[in-house]
Every structure is written in structure tokens, then in C-alpha cells.
Design a protein with these regions (language model features):
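Short, Lys/Arg-enriched, Trp-marked, Pro/Gly-tolerant hinge/linker segments that flank
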Residues: 2-56, 69-81
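Residue-level recognition of oxygen-bearing side chains
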Residues: 96-97, 112
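Intrinsically disordered, low-complexity basic tails/linkers immediately adjacent to helix-turn-helix/homeobox/MYB/SANT
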Residues: 135-136
Length: 136
């Protein structure tokens, strides 16, 4: 009987601890998901992990760990991918210069933008624009 009581108490304690962990994860998931949506809606903004982490009262390291565990990508990768998707849209729909487009998408350096764009798409911004203009 005593052993059964210990097992029951141990089980209840484990459930309490787990539910507390789950509540904490849900709280952070909601906050980090909102940040992720903000990044995707405004990729041109000057995002930096330290400021974002401070916004949710986490250390940058803990923030990055949680972000990766929730979304299976890093915050930095999300920022870059959002900027590249934004650039792709404007390359297809405007005749904005590459220099202006890079600044518009949040890059301080046009060369850095062109390198990242090629890394993620396999082509330069100019090649991407030409390819999509010829499709129309």
C-alpha cells in the first residue's frame, strides 16, 4: 500500500511538473510566433537577436534555443528568408534597381544582398528578374 502511494504521488508530481513546463512553452511559443510573424511582415526592419530576446525577457542564447526548437530554423535564417522572399516579389513586380531593392529589403550592403540572394535562390537578382520577365 505504501509503495502504491509513493508511486501515485510520484506520478502526480511528474504530471504537475510537465504541465508547468507545457504552460511555459505555450507562453513562449505564442510570443515567439508573434515575433516570427512580425519578421515575415516587415523583413526590411533592422532585426537583431539581442533586441528581440530582450523584448521577450530571455537571454539571446535561450531565445535562439527556443526559437529553433519551436520553428526548426533559426531566427536569423527566418530574417534572411523573409528578406529574400520580399526581394523576389519586388524583382518580379517592379523595375526597382538592385541597389535600391537591397536597401528596401533591409540590407545595408548591396554586395551582401546579392551574395545572400544567390546562396538562397541559386541565381543573382538580375538573373532572377530576367527569368521571371521572360516567363510573362
Amino acid at each position: 500500500y505504501k509503495r502504491q502511494m509513493h508511486a501515485l504521488l510520484y506520478s502526480l508530481a511528474g504530471q504537475f511538473h510537465t504541465s508547468k513546463d507545457e504552460r511555459l512553452k505555450n507562453k513562449y511559443f505564442q510570443r515567439l510566433n508573434q515575433i516570427r510573424m512580425n519578421i515575415q511582415n516587415a523583413p526590411h526592419k533592422k532585426w537583431d537577436v539581442t533586441s528581440i530576446a530582450r523584448e521577450v525577457n530571455l537571454s539571446p542564447t535561450h531565445f535562439q534555443r527556443l526559437y529553433k526548437s519551436f520553428f526548426d530554423t533559426t531566427c536569423i535564417q527566418d530574417i534572411i528568408q523573409s528578406r529574400i522572399k520580399n526581394a523576389q516579389f519586388y524583382l518580379r513586380t517592379t523595375d526597382m534597381s538592385i541597389q535600391a531593392l537591397s536597401a528596401f529589403c533591409g540590407y545595408d550592403n548591396e554586395l551582401h544582398f546579392m551574395r545572400q540572394f544567390k546562396k538562397y535562390t541559386g541565381m543573382t537578382p538580375s538573373e532572377y528578374r530576367k527569368m521571371h520577365l521572360s516567363i510573362k
